[in-house]
Design a protein with these regions (language model features):
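Proteins with a high burden of low-complexity, intrinsically disordered sequence enriched in S/T/G/P/A and R
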Residues: 6-9, 16, 28, 33, ...
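Basic side chains
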Residues: 2-3, 59, 66, 144, ...
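Secretory targeting and sorting signals
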Residues: 1-24, 381-398
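Domain-terminus/edge residues, biased toward the C-terminal soluble/receptor-binding domains
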Residues: 151-154, 162-167, 171-409, 413
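Active-site-adjacent loops and short helices of periplasmic peptidoglycan-processing enzymes
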Residues: 22-188, 196
Length: 414
């Protein structure tokens, strides 16, 4: 089976912040406008927890269990594959897409049925199609949870039915959703008000059970859940002005309460972050002297702009490390890479930008090199030393001649 690239090193570093106990201790409690017993909202690019309430408490999570079902499917199967409906028969009160015995459907459509309609029959078809059996798939779910560091999560089924061994926490759900959002197909589906399943024995169209999609333009995901034991659960996401949030509310008493709590989290969290330009394209960040051209300098500029999210009023959370030459020599073409800038945040390098020549520098002419060489302190010092030595030698020779002239002549006796 294939392994999809869903978790980059940079992303996992950010996710580690959401799971760190120290970070949890620093996170403020959620505002009074949020009534959910367990809630959390994070800023995705840094993993900063805007607020948290009982975020690590283990609770029943209903159909948000299907987020792990989705992740394993995206990592282990191709969207173009076709899976056969399982023998699982959901009861009339379970959410389902109406798969018929032996019906075959493309994985992409089963995923739409899983994420939009929350179909239990779609979940079982995916589980058995990926791992061969439900038990094998559940084992894989728990292995994946451990690798992601979801320390308050355990799965007992790929659907989300209530059970003592099927639970998670608000923080773990947010971590899982953040990983899933790196997948373009997932992001598109969960941000759709509806979806049409075109394969199978008949065409089916379903509305997204996350009714915030389409109602609030900035909401762009993710997944609802509901059982008697879980109450009403919503793992959500929202984006505004380049700031991406992911949230979770657990154990709310109704759909209305679930939605109200989620929107309250966003209204509270968005103003607490700002997007800054840490590095600005074509703005000089270093200068280098140009060899053989007295007083001339070359400006070095970033080749692109880097934007970062920081807590509002804390631009100093981002620092820059400039690595550039102090002296350059032509020929240098405009745009030639000569150095770099490292953007650091949270004690880590989060981006590296090339420093390029803002203008061209022609090769120095021989006359310039000669003139510069003649003006060099080393050359001047050398000439001065040579003149001094010559003067000393002349003085010594002159004194020697005078000494010889002054000596009396010696005559021999007869």
């Amino acid at each position: 089976m294939r392994r999809a690239a869903g978790t980059s090193a940079a992303l996992l570093a950010a996710l580690a912040l959401t799971a760190a106990p120290a970070q949890a201790a620093k996170a403020p409690d959620c505002p009074d406008s949020v009534k959910a017993p367990s809630a959390i909202v994070i800023e995705v690019s840094t993993g900063t927890v805007a607020c948290a309430r009982q975020a690590d408490k283990e609770r029943s999570i209903g159909s948000t269990t299907k987020l792990m079902t989705a992740l394993l499917t995206l990592e282990e199967a191709k969207l173009s594959q076709t899976f056969k409906a399982s023998s699982y028969r959901p009861s009339s009160i379970e959410s389902q897409i109406g798969l018929q015995p032996g019906e075959r459907m493309r994985v992409s459509d089963l995923m739409r049925g899983l994420l939009l309609e929350s179909g239990n029959d779609a979940a079982m078809a995916l589980a058995q199609g990926v791992s061969g059996s439900t038990k094998a798939f559940v084992r894989a779910m728990n292995r994946r949870a451990r690798r992601l560091g979801l320390s308050h999560t355990h799965y007992d089924n790929p659907i989300g039915l209530d059970g003592a061994k099927n639970y998670s926490s608000a923080r773990d759900l947010v971590t899982l959703a953040t990983v899933l959002r790196t997948n373009a197909f997932f992001k598109k589906v969960v941000d759709s008000p509806s979806g049409t399943l075109k394969t199978g024995v008949r065409q089916r169209t379903f509305r997204n059970r996350n009714t915030l999609i389409g109602k609030f333009p900035y909401v762009n995901g993710v997944k609802t859940g509901h059982t008697r034991g879980a109450g009403y659960v919503l793992v959500g996401s929202a984006s505004r002005n380049g700031i991406q949030l992911v949230s979770a509310v657990l154990a709310t008493p109704s759909e209305a309460a679930r939605d109200a709590d989620t929107i309250a989290l966003y209204k509270w969290a968005f103003p607490r972050f700002q997007r800054i330009r840490a590095v600005i394209e074509d703005r000089p960040m270093a200068t280098a002297q140009i060899r053989y051209r007295s007083g001339a300098e070359l400006k070095l500029v970033p080749d692109r702009t880097i934007r970062r999210i920081v807590p509002r009023g804390h631009r100093q959370a981002v620092s820059l490390k400039v690595d550039a030459p102090s002296v350059v020599e032509g020929p240098i073409r405009r745009g030639q890479r000569l150095g770099k800038v490292e953007v650091r945040q949270g004690g880590k390098t989060v981006a590296t930008v090339a420093l390029i020549a803002q203008s061209a520098v022609p090769a120095a002419k021989i006359a310039q090199k000669t003139k510069t060489a003649a003006q060099s302190p080393w050359v001047i010092g050398g000439v001065a030393s040579a003149l001094l030595l010559a003067t000393v030698l002349l003085a010594v020779r002159r004194r020697a001649r005078l000494t010889r002239r002054r000596r009396p002549r010696q005559t021999s006796a007869a």
